């Protein structure tokens, strides 16, 4: 990401007031942020959000849940507007980093139809457009079991949105297409030929969403993966074991197909609050096929909103090791030990890496809207991973369960 561009974006509040007055307040500046402390009760692994390189262990960390965002909107005329959004948060480089979340031109074709061109949010979740805006959400953070399953937050391309009322129900359909490169812990994931369809039905306090996304995934700078793929191919050729070469092709992530299907429901009726999502991920590479879901329920008591969430991530399918247990008689002495090492590495794939693994989480929390545009949240998660689950930097012997606590102050301006 070009730091100079983002620095200019984040400096907009210093330079646009005069411009806004001169142009009849055409430029609008808004922002959001979260100041948080996060900790856990286990020092053998770290808890972090998706795309973070480090997280909280048995110490207090500000970077896991804290962020600051700024958005600038400029209305050129009644059919064209420009939007840019910058976000500062702890990222895959193990420190606070700046990113350009959105940067698009919006063309209003009619009252029902609009087109955006540039960097737009990728509509794959119930709260895709405001997942980083803590104040807009009941929970302190989106459940990682679901929201870790797609590494892309935005797409460089375009989307088209069509909205129509049918009696008391409003239907919104959104189709996005493009490509993006997303940094993760020590490597990048590239998605090309991304196509995402998002359909939302709203009726009173209820919102139903259905989505489908597909892409071609490439991971070409992950050292451990490249070493394994190269070793399998070398062993396959050197020991005349073609199944190893075939296995290397199955593991390698190079223009591999991937799909993500999801459905979600929200309700805010009287004092009851409900939010739930169910998702299925499938890929033709080393990345696991998964099922993930969560259900959150809460009840509003004055300015307080206590809530409970149950979330789960399960592996449906993963790479199966076809490495032989031993080499045939007469092969070099080093052959069987080599196969044993390769087999162990292949078997570790389903439970290691970003967005891999299985886990369940029980969450209790409370939101307190004690002032205008400001909310205080306290949340405790009890996480039961299978293996490492979604924890990062796990040490030998880590197993869980782990308790994670956080206090956050969300605000918008």
Model segments located where?
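Outer-membrane beta-barrel pore domains
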Residues: 42-44, 56-57, 104-108, 214, ...
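Short, flexible helix-coil linker/hinge segments at the edges of structured domains or between repeats
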Residues: 130-142, 224-237
């Amino acid at each position: 990401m070009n730091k100079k561009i983002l620095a200019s974006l984040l400096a907009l509040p210093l330079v646009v007031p005069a411009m806004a007055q001169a142009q009849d307040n055409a430029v609008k500046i808004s922002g959001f942020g979260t100041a948080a402390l996060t900790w856990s009760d286990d020092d053998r692994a770290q808890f972090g959000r998706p795309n973070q390189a480090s997280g909280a262990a048995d110490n207090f960390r500000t970077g896991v849940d804290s962020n600051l965002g700024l958005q600038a909107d400029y209305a050129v005329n009644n059919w064209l507007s420009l939007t840019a959004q910058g976000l500062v948060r702890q990222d895959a480089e193990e420190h606070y980093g700046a990113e350009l979340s959105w940067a698009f031109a919006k063309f209003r074709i009619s009252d029902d139809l609009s087109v955006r061109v540039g960097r737009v949010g990728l509509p794959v979740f119930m709260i895709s457009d405001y997942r980083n805006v803590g104040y807009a959400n009941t929970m302190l953070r989106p459940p990682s079991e679901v929201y870790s399953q797609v590494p892309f937050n935005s797409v460089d391309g375009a989307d088209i949105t069509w909205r129509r009322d049918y009696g008391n129900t409003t239907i919104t359909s959104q189709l996005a297409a493009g490509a993006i490169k997303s940094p993760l812990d020590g490597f990048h994931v590239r998605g090309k030929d991304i196509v995402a369809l998002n359909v939302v039905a709203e009726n009173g306090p209820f919102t139903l969403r259905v989505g489908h996304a597909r892409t071609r995934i490439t991971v070409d700078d992950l050292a451990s993966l490249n070493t394994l793929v190269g070793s399998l191919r070398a062993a396959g050729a050197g020991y005349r074991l073609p199944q190893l070469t075939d296995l290397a092709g199955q593991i390698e992530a190079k223009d591999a197909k991937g799909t993500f299907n999801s459905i979600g429901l929200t309700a805010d009726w009287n004092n009851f609050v409900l939010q739930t999502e169910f998702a299925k991920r499938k890929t033709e590479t080393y990345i696991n096929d998964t099922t993930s879901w969560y259900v959150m329920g809460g009840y509003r008591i004055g300015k307080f909103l206590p809530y409970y969430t149950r979330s789960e991530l399960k592996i449906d399918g993963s790479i199966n090791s076809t490495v032989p247990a031993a080499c045939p008689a007469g092969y070099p002495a080093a052959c069987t030990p080599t196969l044993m090492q390769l087999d162990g590495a292949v078997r570790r794939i389903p439970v290691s890496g970003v967005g891999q693994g299985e886990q369940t989480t029980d969450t209790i929390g409370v939101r307190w809207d004690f002032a205008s545009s400001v909310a205080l949240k306290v949340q405790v998660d009890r996480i039961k991973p299978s293996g490492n689950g979604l924890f990062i930097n796990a040490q030998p012997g880590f197993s869980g369960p782990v308790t994670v606590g956080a206090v956050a102050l969300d605000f918008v301006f």
